[in-house]
Amino acid sequence: MTDSDPTLRPDRLPEDVQATDDRALRPQSLDDFTGQEEARANLRVFIESARRRGEAMDHVLFHGPPGLGKTTLAQIMAKELGVGFRMTSGPVLAKAGDLAAILTNLEAKDVLFIDEIHRLNPVVEEILYPALEDFELDLVIGEGPAARTVRIELQPFTLVGATTRLGLLTTPLRDRFGIPTRLNFYTIAELDQIVARGARLAGIEADPKGTAEIAKRARGTPRIAGRLLRRVIDFAVVEGDGRLTQGIADSALTRLGVDDLGLDGADRRYLSLIAENYHGGPVGIETVAAALAEPRDALEEVIEPFLLQQGLIARTPRGRMLAHKGWTHLGMAPPKRPDQGELI
């Protein structure tokens, strides 16, 4: 049911890393999927409604931080609907012809998944509008005075878009998705279930305290939990007795630079920079990006969401500031702020 045509995905995307290992760990149905209770409950209703009506399901937009299951949910949707699944990404669709080639090859009610949909070429996006609303494709053939428009009828299909940057989607595109769904960070209990399931599928005997230790440090993200689990298993096999215990998990993750809260070296450099160089802020994001030699997008999409969710930093109109919890995590005392009497 899943089309893995390499022409659709010539470049490896972030979720393709460790794809072979992840495929076995990915749930195959909504019942197997852990977490995102509200999103799953709603999707179950929409899927069942589409099946009973015998129609293509309305278009879906998944948005939220990376690694929370957007691709997995799209694949599950296709399986639950009993239809074909095609996958591509925004940057790959450089020309209108690229999109036309995919859309014209879709069967009735198929699911087309476009990752990083906020990075669609504006020209391609314009072509997508009538396809989403009327299942029609308007293509311009030829150039200059000889140019003419050809309308192509499409089979009804379901577009599933995924983005980590909802604000970068144009309003016309965003409004054409009938089912916008936000995915949130997972709880430690949910991640514990995911880690335990992963260990079981890997054939590793896991102590409940061991899986809980990994879940606690997984930053609320299943993809990170899976990556940490694989590394802890490596340590358990080589330096332990093959069992995943709390001791081996703590030792392995500490050696990998992942602390008790799940922060890694990049996170701690971010916090330390604001604390030591800018006295806790506020400091502009461009300044932080330049000082860390990291792209602004990487900070806003990868590092900051979890720090904000944990209350370690704050975004203000004047820039980023270290919150009290951030100072505490670094083991530092926040600088004393001058009171009004001292200012006068």
Curated annotation (Swiss-Prot):
Query: Does this entry carry the keyword Chaperone?
Result: no
The primary location reported for this protein is: cytoplasm
GO MF, one annotated term:
ATP hydrolysis activity
Q: Which stretches does the entry tag as region Large ATPase domain (RuvB-L)?
A: 1-186
Q: Which GO terms describe its cellular component?
A: cytoplasm; Holliday junction resolvase complex
Kindly list the positions annotated as binding DNA: R296, R315, R320
**Any idea what this protein is called?**
Holliday junction branch migration complex subunit RuvB
Q: Which organism is it from?
A: Jannaschia sp. (strain CCS1)
List the top taxonomic levels of the source: Bacteria, Pseudomonadati, Pseudomonadota, Alphaproteobacteria, Rhodobacterales
Its gene is ruvB
